[in-house]
């Protein structure tokens, strides 16, 4: 009998498929997100150099930071950091998460800062 995948295992498998496609097709840096129940994290990664350029998270906030408002604030911070590093085009990797809620708020906040993807 086939073993059923949990929701998180299915998301991880989807993330690997997406990441492999992105690596093959583009030379742009990749922003990917991770969300836990209480926090939200984002990293800018250069696949050519195999190096993390920028890493941000909401875990250092004293107030609850697992909501849409915190993700939006993090998106504005990430957009501002990308401007200072003169990066205006990226590839957004949502890590297998649905484009809704915190992921959507983060992406739209980065677009408001002028980042194109």
UniProtKB/Swiss-Prot annotation:
This is one of the proteins that bind and probably mediate the attachment of the 5S RNA into the large ribosomal subunit, where it forms part of the central protuberance. GO terms for molecular function: 5S rRNA binding; structural constituent of ribosome. InterPro entries: Ribosomal_uL18_bac-type, Ribosomal_uL18_bac/euk. GO terms for cellular component: cytoplasm; ribonucleoprotein complex; ribosome. One of its GO terms (biological process) is translation. It comes from the Bacteria. PANTHER family: 39S RIBOSOMAL PROTEIN L18, MITOCHONDRIAL (PTHR12899), LARGE RIBOSOMAL SUBUNIT PROTEIN UL18M (PTHR12899:SF3). SUPFAM superfamilies: Translational machinery components. Keywords: Ribonucleoprotein, Ribosomal protein, RNA-binding, rRNA-binding. Belongs to the universal ribosomal protein uL18 family. Transmembrane segments: none annotated. HAMAP family: Ribosomal_uL18_B. Gene3D superfamilies: 3.30.420.100. Part of the 50S ribosomal subunit; part of the 5S rRNA/L5/L18/L25 subcomplex. Contacts the 5S and 23S rRNAs. This is Large ribosomal subunit protein uL18. It comes from Mycoplasma mobile (strain ATCC 43663 / 163K / NCTC 11711) (Mesomycoplasma mobile).
């Amino acid at each position: 009998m086939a073993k059923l995948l949990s929701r998180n295992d299915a998301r991880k498998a989807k993330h690997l498929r997406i990441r492999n496609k992105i690596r093959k097709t583009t030379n742009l840096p990749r922003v990917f997100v991770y969300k836990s129940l209480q926090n939200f994290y984002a990293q800018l990664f250069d696949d050519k150099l195999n190096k993390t350029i920028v890493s941000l998270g909401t875990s250092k906030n004293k107030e609850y930071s697992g909501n849409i408002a915190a993700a939006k604030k993090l998106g504005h911070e990430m957009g501002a950091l990308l401007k200072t590093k003169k990066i205006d085009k990226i590839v957004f990797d949502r890590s297998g998460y649905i484009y809704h809620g915190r992921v959507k708020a983060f992406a739209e906040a980065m677009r408001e800062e002028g980042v194109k993807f």
